[in-house]
């Protein structure tokens, strides 16, 4: 009984900061976009609008729950829960510091890839169960987009695995103590980041929820409390993807110079280093949203299959070839 309570406490210790970071990610996005568009942004609720996400959450919770009469009600309610659960499960293998991971098992990378692939089911259920043309078309777009860019995403991760020789996320971080992988793998980092934008349905790849075409895409018929689940899942995926990018290419919780990290320090500076890197990647997500226009859907698919995929395959062949040629393979 004590072990179960201890495990639940561990999960809460990880889950609460994640949900808070998701809440404040919305404030960061609105303030940054406001600055880029020469306007103030939210500035009423709390100091520097820090209480704005809680006001938005309260507004959504007290709204009326409207259910379409022709909807498949079981899947209609299940879809946002599935999407949020798979978004949060990805944090189970993320090391937030040395020894600070819920589960540090040897196949953590494969676990993360599997969850990112399964997460599309919630979106597909949402579009189909709502019995709406807008929602259904949005879910089909999302499914096709995520399956397509999953290939690029997986190829980029596989290149990192070939370089470090392990599937364990902690070992990948520890292998970057001297050199972060963004330096030797810069083209692969660019491919990974572009595919991460597509995986999270962010601009310029936000076709599944294009407001001017599909109202709100697969979320069109969802409102009130169940819409909050989709909202949390979307921004939770952005925070997770930013942290994962920092781990794979920016050294995770490693940071130079090492003298900053005294072993007897009261403050866990290494976790702060990971958080700073993740926030910088999140800023990049917001910057791209405020800068780039939405792509046409046929251009998006052509860009993936005829542009990015051949480059990803070529780089995936080049990385092990160079490792073998210079006799620096980790295997």
Curated annotation (Swiss-Prot):
The gene is ND1. GO terms for cellular component: mitochondrial inner membrane; respiratory chain complex I. It comes from Mycosarcoma maydis. Pfam families: NADHdh (PF00146). It is a multi-pass membrane protein. GO terms for biological process: aerobic respiration. It is an enzyme of class 7 (translocase). This is NADH-ubiquinone oxidoreductase chain 1. The keyword Coiled coil does not apply. It catalyses: a ubiquinone + NADH + 5 H(+)(in) = a ubiquinol + NAD(+) + 4 H(+)(out). Keywords: Electron transport, Membrane, Mitochondrion, Mitochondrion inner membrane, NAD, Respiratory chain, Translocase, Transmembrane, Transmembrane helix, Transport, Ubiquinone. PROSITE patterns: COMPLEX1_ND1_2. Its EC number is 7.1.1.2. The chain crosses the membrane at residues 8-28, 75-95, 107-127, 147-167, 178-198, 224-244, 266-286, 308-328. Belongs to the complex I subunit 1 family. GO terms for molecular function: NADH dehydrogenase (ubiquinone) activity. Core subunit of the mitochondrial membrane respiratory chain NADH dehydrogenase (Complex I) that is believed to belong to the minimal assembly required for catalysis. Complex I functions in the transfer of electrons from NADH to the respiratory chain. The immediate electron acceptor for the enzyme is believed to be ubiquinone. Its main location: mitochondrion. The lineage of its organism: Eukaryota, Fungi, Dikarya, Basidiomycota, Ustilaginomycotina. It is found in: Mitochondrion inner membrane.
